[in-house]
């Protein structure tokens, strides 16, 4: 088992090298330098000082500026390398690479940021990247990133998400299991459900507790044609915050969880909202009827002591058949693992640390970070546990991503690298004497129309 897993890591590294058509050696050594660095990556140029990067810092800059990554091939590689024993449950979320002061960087947009403010508002200018990570139900923070895409300011977030999910579904194995995609409350569940209605996918999205939904209208008695007016499109009204309007649930699940105590999951199937003929529905002759299941999750207590008293969660599900209530509420709680992945990518691997100029360079660096995360997951059972004196010993299967990264340098010395050694040459002539570079073009951040 162990030998087969390490062979998978070696094969993944070779295939990753094949996904780099231009500046492959420098780009691959850049990933090794970031994985083998002794501390968090705070400066990408400093990675050229790591022994795993055998080239100069100039090659590092040129690799990010002029290199090329085959995104389609790398996406297929990530899907094939994902754990086969994990369920087809995926978390989808976007994170912002803030570039507030980068006036020379094009295609910046304004995005919400909970930790950084601009002019007193939680809004920053930068690039938005949407990640898709496969989740597991094991009690750890490991995820398997399978895709990352930059959403431009001119794109509609819902349309971009639908295209990204469709592209991933085409790459997944078709063994009868329908993939479940979990979204936070910032996404439009109705738009996603409508756009993915003909895809092999389930959509699970958190909704506010003041949303209103409707049942199907009751059947009308037979009447002569041309009498009775237009038939109703909506039935009984259900407001999530008003218990009196709920009606009889379609399905109820009660269980006991060691972390949350008594868990009650209630579902109402065949519900739909009342849509207006504007925004994305303006092109429709009549707003569509988008049906789904409303799921209410109530827990006895939260895992840790907190001042928060709200212990109720509302979800909207859509997909073929009816939802698996036990899988739905557990999948949404595991969705928060993608937040841990973002923290690892930013604080440890330095995803948003480099001050890159163009979005194309940012996309290349993002793909490299995704490849780093995949290598850490494949190497978790083969690295030495270089724990700090105050840390408890762990079994190889229980190592965290950060502790796995500490031992990657020793493992890399054993498995080697597919990158070729550098070819030494003399320095070039440089810039002709007396020439000056013209001022660079300024690009204002794009404000998306409401």
What feature does the model see in each segment?
Residues 1-65:
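Gly/serine-rich nucleotide phosphate-binding loop at the start of the catalytic core
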Residues 62-140, 145, 284:
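Active-site-proximal, Lys/Arg-enriched surface segment
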Residues 32-34, 133, 369-373:
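Contiguous, well-ordered alpha-helical segments that form the cores/surfaces of helical PPI scaffolds
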Residues 26, 39-42, 55, 59, ...:
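Generic alpha-helix structural propensity
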Residues 47, 93, 132-134, 203, ...:
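Short low-polarity hydrophobic stretches
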Residues 50, 77-80, 167-172:
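A generic secondary-structure signal
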Residues 36, 49, 62-67, 117-122, ...:
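Short secondary-structure transition/capping motifs
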Residues 1-23, 103, 139-450:
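Single, function-defining residue in the core of a domain
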């Amino acid at each position: 088992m162990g030998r087969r897993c390490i062979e998978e890591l070696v094969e993944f590294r070779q295939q990753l090298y094949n996904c780099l058509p231009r500046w492959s050696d420098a780009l691959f050594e850049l990933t090794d330098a970031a994985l083998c660095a002794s501390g968090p990556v705070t400066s990408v140029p400093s990675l050229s000082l790591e022994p795993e990067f055998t080239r100069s810092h100039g090659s590092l800059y040129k690799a990010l500026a002029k290199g090329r990554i085959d995104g389609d091939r790398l996406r297929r590689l990530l899907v094939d390398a994902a754990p086969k024993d994990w369920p087809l449950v995926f978390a989808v979320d976007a994170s912002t690479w803030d570039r507030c002061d980068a006036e020379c960087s094009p295609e910046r947009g304004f995005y919400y940021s909970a930790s950084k403010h601009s002019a007193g508002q939680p809004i920053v200018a930068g690039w938005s990247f949407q990640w898709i990570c496969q989740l597991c139900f094991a009690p750890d923070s490991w995820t398997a990133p399978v895709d990352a895409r930059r959403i431009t300011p001119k794109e509609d977030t819902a349309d971009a998400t639908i295209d990204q999910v469709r592209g991933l579904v085409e790459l997944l194995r078709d063994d009868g299991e329908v993939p479940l995609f979990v979204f936070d409350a910032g996404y439009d569940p109705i738009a996603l459900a409508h756009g993915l209605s003909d895809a092999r996918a389930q959509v699970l999205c958190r909704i506010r507790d003041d949303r209103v939904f409707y049942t199907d209208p009751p059947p009308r008695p037979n009447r002569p044609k041309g009498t009775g007016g237009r038939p109703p499109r909506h039935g009984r009204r259900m407001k999530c915050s008003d218990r009196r309007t709920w009606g009889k649930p379609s399905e109820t699940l009660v269980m006991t969880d060691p972390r949350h105590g008594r868990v009650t999951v209630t579902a109402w199937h065949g519900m739909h909202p009342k849509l207006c003929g504007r925004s994305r529905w303006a092109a429709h002759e009549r707003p569509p009827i988008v049906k789904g299941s409303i799921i209410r999750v109530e827990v006895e207590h939260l895992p840790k002591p907190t001042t928060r008293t709200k212990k109720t969660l509302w979800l909207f599900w859509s997909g073929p058949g009816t939802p698996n209530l036990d899988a739905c509420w557990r999948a949404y709680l595991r969705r928060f693992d993608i937040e841990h992945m973002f923290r690892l990518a930013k604080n440890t691997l330095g995803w948003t640390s480099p001050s890159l100029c163009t979005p194309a360079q940012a996309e290349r660096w993002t793909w490299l970070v995704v490849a780093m995360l995949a290598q850490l997951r494949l190497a978790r059972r083969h690295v030495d546990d270089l724990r700090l004196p105050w840390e408890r010993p762990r079994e190889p299967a229980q190592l965290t991503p950060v502790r796995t990264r500490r031992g990657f340098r020793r493992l890399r010395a054993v498995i080697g690298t597919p990158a070729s050694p550098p070819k030494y040459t003399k320095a070039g002539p440089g810039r002709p004497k007396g020439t000056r570079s013209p001022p660079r073009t300024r690009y204002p951040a794009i404000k998306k129309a409401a």
